[in-house]
Amino acid sequence: MLFTPPLIPATLISRYKRFLFDAVLEDGTAITGSCPNTGSMRGLTTPGSRIWLSEHDSPTRKYRHMFEMVEADGTVVGINTGMPNRLAEEAILNGRIPELAGYSTIRREQKYGRNSRIDFLLSEPGRPDAYVEVKNVHFMREKGLAEFPDTATKRGAKHLEELGDAAEAGYRSVMLYLIQRDDCERMRICADLDPIYALAFQRAMARGVEAYAVKCAVSPTQISVSGTVKMDEWRPAVL
């Protein structure tokens, strides 16, 4: 996925109220913009960090600039939580995720479960439908190891339970973790920050849910899925 025009570099001053950030552009202009990530963004909001912004001229927007990427640990990291579904769809259609290849139809936001919508429903004659839920990942504490979640997520645990229900009903159920950085070779479930999600993940795997992780090549000019990442196993004492 290309950014046209390319993103604008800036220096982060602060990110606050979850939705807002202050920054200074390269010409010295101080700006306030919108942050398309309501999560903790743990480790990605250090004042003075180099960041990249998209620019929008729509008169209906309150803020002209949107926070898109940040340099952290020597690599560029995507922070826009609206991006993973777009990247996943592009990668699935282009066959870049082998585990999800071979489906001729892809539908977005289909109703399923208990008043929920699945990110993607993949269909192919002669094969069970595949329900695919996508999660955004950018948290890293140990070099080369991405982790999810970076804070407690009841909604995430609910998604795992509903995927398990679909798997037991005979459908293919897939949790796809999309990592918006390229400096990782492994991914694991972050049990210390959200033990409830970790238990829900293990239960889902036992019910037949599949889990895959992919990383992205990220730059101010483009972002795309670049390869698969091994998922570390984590087993709780009690299911």
Swiss-Prot record:
Looking up Gene3D superfamilies in the UniProt record yields: 2.40.50.580, 3.40.1350.60
A GO molecular function annotation here is: DNA binding
> Which ranges form a coiled coil?
none
A Pfam entry, by short name: SfsA_N
Q: Which family does it belong to?
A: Belongs to the SfsA family.
HAMAP family membership: SfsA
- What protein am I looking at? Sugar fermentation stimulation protein homolog
Q: Which gene encodes it?
A: sfsA
